[in-house]
Amino acid sequence: MRTIISFVIFCVLFFPNFVNAENSGNKWSFYTGMFDFSDDGKKSNLFGIQHINEDLYRETSFGTFQPVTGAFITADNAKYIYTGFQIPKKNGSFTFTPSFTPGLYDEGDGKDLGHAIEFKTEIQISFEISDQSEIGLSYNHISNASLGDKNPGANSYMFNFIKVY
């Protein structure tokens, strides 16, 4: 896990941009944190990556809907791959971003969430550190909405680094 995190940090910080980042419309979020922190028996470190396409959006009365796609893996080899939307609300250098992303979950050696189909709801607060970078903190809840026989859910927190590429 440390090797993966070190490699991603190296790429993010030192890999040259081959496109004009200001006009690309593509953001990547790299995050790490604690999966299911509220369950002492099953909590686990996690690492994930998420793509945010700012060029594909829909204006609604709720705000700007942007598509997101991503995945994470835990130290217990649980995996979640997802796609959905987020609604960023910018206020100065801060951005508040709720999101909803259905996805597929594989428990690996981690927590059994009761079904392969899971729904992730998340809130994130980020701070713009440059025109092309943000740091943030997020909290999410993953649940199968009672699709399975059991629905224990999982609560997680993450530290995010978001960069325009």
PLM region descriptions:
Residues 43-49, 127, 152-165:
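Outer-membrane beta-barrel "beta-signal"
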Residues 35-45, 71-82, 109-116, 146-154:
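Solvent-exposed loop/turn segments connecting transmembrane beta-strands
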Residues 27-36, 62-74, 97-106, 138-143:
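Transmembrane beta-strand segments that form the barrel wall of outer-membrane beta-barrel proteins
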Residues 49, 85, 96, 123-125, ...:
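Membrane-embedded beta-strands that build the outer-membrane beta-barrel scaffold
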Residues 94-121:
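Mid-chain, well-packed structural core segment of small domains
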